[in-house]
Amino acid sequence: MPLSFGVHIPTCIEGMMYPIPFARTEDILPTALLCERLGFDSVWGNDHMTTQRYVQREFADPPNYYEPLVTFAYVAARTTRLRVCTCILVLPMRHMVVAAKQAATLDQLSGGRLTLGVGTGAYREEYEALFPDAKGAHRGTLVDEGMRALRRLFTERRVTFLGRYVRFEEVECFPKPVQDPLPLYAGGNHAEVRRRAGELGDGWLPAVLSPEEIRRGAEDVRRAAERAARDGARIDIAPQLVVSIGRTQDEALRRFRGSQLFKHLESLSRTTLREQTGGYEQRNLIGSPEAISERIRAYQAAGVTTLAGMLFVASTVTEMQDAIELFGREVLPNFR
């Protein structure tokens, strides 16, 4: 299977992956068009509703978070080939019928180019800010129920779903997506996410893992698929990695360690990345174009089929676009 390449474009990135201010609305489309022109396969965006506490402590001004499905409707209207993908859509913050309606509409408008990566979200504080009366909720169970509900809403005429958290009755949700099935990816690194990807997903969307960690995780996904009588070989292994590209290894490493993205990874050490201990340089794409190409081959050998939502180290949108262009010109052709 040829390796697919995706780039994370500005949605909910200020203050976490990049400084404040970073991207304006008028920066979003040119970044997506650059990706399409260079031959990338997809663009990806994340999902946040309110500012994280660690971001509030670091920055005086609040970040701009652009809602991903609305953003991708705009991007899809102005592109012809790029897939538009979420990494991730935070299901616990959304009503499943509304999420299904939005996703199916976007898949129709884009001509079948949507991939829906979903998960619990890295910051429980954000969920509790939106739902202060539901602080004891088990978000993993909510995501399991949500993925099952979405599958049914995408395919069945009339749906009643009475789960622990997801509950609705006699809902007809039309139009259906163009794609059958609309790809649903399970986002996260935890063992429960690997089980979820195997049982319910079309893809596994982890973050910042080494090739060997990916190899072991993909085996877990395939075993979970087999237990659910599904074909694990058809599940896309799609990690999200940070890219720090430079003319030399030292230059790329220096940029990475001084970046807002590095600080973001440190913040995730208490949530998404809690099972990893340091070693970010071995779990991302850092170095010259030649070194990065070699590292990608190691990921490919470990079973990776998509590099999802690559996050390019930068302090400005121009720097980000320059890094995307360098990757597109000097790394991407090695895999075409």
Each language-model region and where it sits:
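Short, acidic/polar
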Residues: 22-35, 99-102, 186-196, 288-298
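N-terminal beta1-alpha1-beta2 module of alpha/beta enzyme domains
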Residues: 1-78, 180-182
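An alpha-helical appendage that flanks or caps ligand/catalytic pockets
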Residues: 9, 36, 136-173, 211-305, ...
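Flexible, glycine-rich active-site loops centered on histidine and acidic residues
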Residues: 2-23, 91-160, 208-215, 219, ...
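Hydrophobic faces of well-ordered beta-strands that scaffold small-molecule active sites
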Residues: 5-9, 43-45, 83-86, 114-118, ...
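Conserved, mostly hydrophobic/aromatic
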Residues: 35, 39, 47, 75, ...
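Active-site mouth loops of central-metabolism enzymes
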Residues: 11-26, 88-97, 177-189, 243-246, ...
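Alpha-helix-loop-beta-strand connector modules within alpha/beta enzyme cores
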Residues: 57-84, 142-149, 153, 227, ...
